[in-house]
Amino acid sequence: MVPGGEIQELATSLKLELKEQMNIKYALKSPAHITLKMPFSYNEAKEKVLIEKLENFLSTKKSLIIKVGGTDTFGKRVIFWKVQADSSLTELQTDLKTFCKRELNLVDELSDRNYHPHMTIAFKDVKERDFDEAKALIQKSDINHPLHVCSVELLKRLDGKWVVIQSLKMASD
């Protein structure tokens, strides 16, 4: 799920500031997003079929409200904004996991079984010496933002960057 507007602008601005001040730039390879399914390989010739199947699946799922607020970490390697939602987000992820296994023949990954929704701001290239300063910079953003999610975006890696290739609408409320 790739939010637009203010939240995307703030995340990008923080990523650019981290790059400028500490040369932390890996997170700039993708827009700020909340992952529902980890990256997977898929036959490019069947991409249109993939999109159609995902459109059909998501057209039955209701939009949801989530809140992006607060900063947390995974160890000393990943700094992210926390995502809070009711059970509808976990249900969507579980349903998508089942759909991907059944309809796309994709295997369950560890991250599919241990879902922890978040929005990464810095990861992989955060040096230990910069970690606390980077975390403090992100915490200063003091984000507390409700988000109405009415679409899910399909990202594809092109020329080393993740780009949205399709926005898939969810059912109207």
Please state what every model-predicted region is.
Residues 1-65, 86-145, 162-173:
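Basic, often amphipathic N-terminal segments
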Residues 30, 74-75, 158:
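Structural motif
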Residues 68-70, 151, 167:
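Extracellular/lumenal ectodomain signal focusing on beta-strand-rich modules
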Residues 75-78, 82, 87, 91:
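Charge-rich, low-complexity N-terminal segments
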Residues 138-140, 148-156:
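Low-complexity, intrinsically disordered Gly/Pro/Thr-rich segments
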